[in-house]
Amino acid sequence: MSKKITLIVLAFFASIFLVACGKSPDVTANANGTKIGDTIKIGVNMELTGAVAAYGKAEQNGIKLAVDEINKAGGVDGKKLELVTKDNKSENAEASTSSTNLAIQSNVNAIVGPATSGAVAAASLVSQKTGVPLLTPSGTQDDLTVDAKGTKKFVFRTTFKDSYQGKVLAAYSYNNLNAKKVVLYYDNASDYAKGIADEFKREYKGQIVTEATFASGDKDYQSALTKFKDLDYDAIVMPGYYTETGIITKQARDLGIDKPILGPDGFSDAKFTELAGKKNASNVYYVAGYSTNVALSDKASGFIEAYKKAYNTDPNMFAALAYDSVYMIAEASKDAKTSVDIADNLAQLKNFVGVTGKMTIDKDHNPIKAALMVKRDNGEEVSAEAVEIEK
């Protein structure tokens, strides 16, 4: 690393420290961004290894497919898209470091990722400080795009937020499944899961028979599940990631618990079925922003065909959201000279049609779009239906 770059990086981290200590009134005050050169440089800050690599790898596939398509069609304003990829290893601290490297050393014009909320939260301050917009395909934590001062100028998302998922789970379980009594079992070590659980508790009209928690990394859930088995309830609502919920589903079915299991978009990966087992992954419902069973736009069938040709498998929600994210950045890059221009254009994006549906970015940088409830039987998605909820 050259002396000049070293000084820039040291100054950047010093400013981060001052912000953390409350010394800076506005972290975006000097966020001048990066200039767009001969190519439009898109940084990819993604969980390619580690605990939730399944999300990151699917999103990387969607990103690459979109970039290839756009470049083959001539790029944006005659400029090709160039990817610079960093593996954040499913670690929040590494996500921050990756964004710093992408923004300061690689001088990217926009960043796609990370995939998970904790990693996005860690990386978002870098975007706020440098003026390089971050668009997370799947980070759902409510406060990722806002803080005490209002909307974060350089942070956006393609998916819906946690509180919306909690509302969808509450409405669908009560109205569609007629589940008037539920067990609420969630990951207390995850802000993502806690946020969904909190909103579910606020919105659910039925009775929560019992509320229990587990922690990320746990492997044995027999004690809690044994207690649930003899209770009177209609469904289990289980906010968390597939890494734990897939195992819990297997252990629940092995104990003879056959009640419907409902969860958030953290269930939306084939790894869930691998962990649960195909037979056990039945009567399972989860929130999703995309399903191959429902065409949310005219672009859906073409995307599925192209994805299967490229990767020999169907795309999941994470791949679709990441694919849309690249096209959103491409749209926002039209006539842009800097990364700040891209951020400004993303904030004004209206009626954008992607494979996950038509969306408009609202004042808090969240998309206004449809949500789905997907049903899984024998490890396969068998149905998907739209759920209308007031945001």
Language-model features, listed with the residues they occupy:
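C-terminal motif of bacterial Sec signal peptides marking the signal peptidase cleavage site
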Residues: F17-A20
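Beta-alpha junction/loop-to-helix N-cap segments that form part of ligand/metal-binding clefts
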Residues: D26-A31, Y55-A58, A73-V146, F214-D218, ...
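Extracytoplasmic "Venus flytrap"
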Residues: N30-G62, K86-A93, A115-T116, Y185-K194, ...
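An alpha-beta-alpha
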Residues: L48, K152-T213, A235
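Hydrophobic alpha-helical segments within soluble ligand-binding/sensing domains
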Residues: A95, R157-K181, K194, D220-Q222, ...
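Extracellular/periplasmic bilobed ligand-binding domains
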Residues: S127, I196-V287
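Extracellular/periplasmic periplasmic-binding protein-like sensory domains
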Residues: T249-Y323, D377, V387-I389
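Segments of small-molecule ligand-sensing domains
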Residues: A310-A319, A330-E381
